[in-house]
Amino acid sequence: GILAFGNVGRNVARIAAGFGMEVYAYDAFCPKEAIEAAGVKAVDCQDALFETCDVVSLHIPATAETKQSINAALVGKMKKGAVLVNTARKEVINEPELLKLMEERADLKYVTDIKPDADADFAKFEGRYFSTPKKMGAQTAEANINAGIAAACQINAFFKDGCTKFKVN
């Protein structure tokens, strides 16, 4: 299951499908038709995603609405033996609630590329918990070169045509 079907979510879905996985997705801002056009099954709400999937991969931004939104009530809906994968932001996870749920459910697994604040507490779930010390998603040589090229192209487009396509504020 893919929570948030932006660029990263779409790529994860494509890779998962390449392994023969049946892929589901939910994105509050992406039309179901766009999800289905990518060969992915759209669900109506995030609860349905967590109830349906053996693995849920998070790709949501950390906003006022999403911070702490991945909580025990939501993760508790996951199937027996399910895996929660967080490659989004650590702020979206309600760590105290997830810790408590993992105490209660010995079948639940959590994988993250962002070391949680409560890493020492999660460490007791050896074999069911894995994290990396820092977010590595975009820290490859190729990604850094591409980011530099993209920034240069955007600056050039602004001065040449007044293009503000990627304006942040």
Stretches found by the model and what they are:
Residues G9-R10:
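N-terminal Rossmann-fold NAD(P) dinucleotide-binding loop
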Residues F5-G6:
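Glycine-rich Rossmann-fold phosphate-binding loop(s) that bind the pyrophosphate
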Residues A25:
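Conserved SAM-binding motif I beta-strand of class I
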Residues M21-E22:
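Residues at the starts of beta-strands that form the adenosine-phosphate
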Residues G1-I2:
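Hydrophobic Val/Ile/Leu positions in short beta-strands of Rossmann-like dinucleotide-binding domains
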